[in-house]
């Protein structure tokens, strides 16, 4: 509204809003999933000296493949989905792709393929289920990327520091994400099969017991 001609010129008149047609280019979070965050590639690097560890996608390859499929810039921000995914209502047309760990995907209750550019119509609801099998993170890329401010050179979320991404935290129900107005509606492209092969096995990751292993975070039984 504020960039509309009457306001931009500083000369609005009493009834100037009557003819204004406004279309929100937003995505509303109906449910957020286990932990869904905004991340970009290569992330926030080079700030260890001031106490900021690297931030960015855990599976940068999957996010980059999604951006490549949609024709996005390599550093376009997307959503990183951990274990279970969000339900999103689109208030504008969009083209999206889901890459990474296999996860159930539907639009308005109709199952949709992964690793494919999908046209989502305004008013539609996209739902992501729970990851099954190997892998823990999937990525939802949107044509043009998620619009959030850069912080220390990146849009990536750093939850412990509470900055970057959408308010420095994982998404919550009721959040509203902004995306660019869709100008290229081309959809249907798929990633080549050799670029989206499944993980061969579930791997064990060795960890060192640290301060976040204290009882207020994890019970002894859970650590075992």
Enumerate the predicted regions with their spans.
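Conserved short loop/turn motifs at secondary-structure junctions
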Residues: 1-4, 82-84
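Conserved "landmark" site that anchors the functional core of diverse proteins
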Residues: 24-224
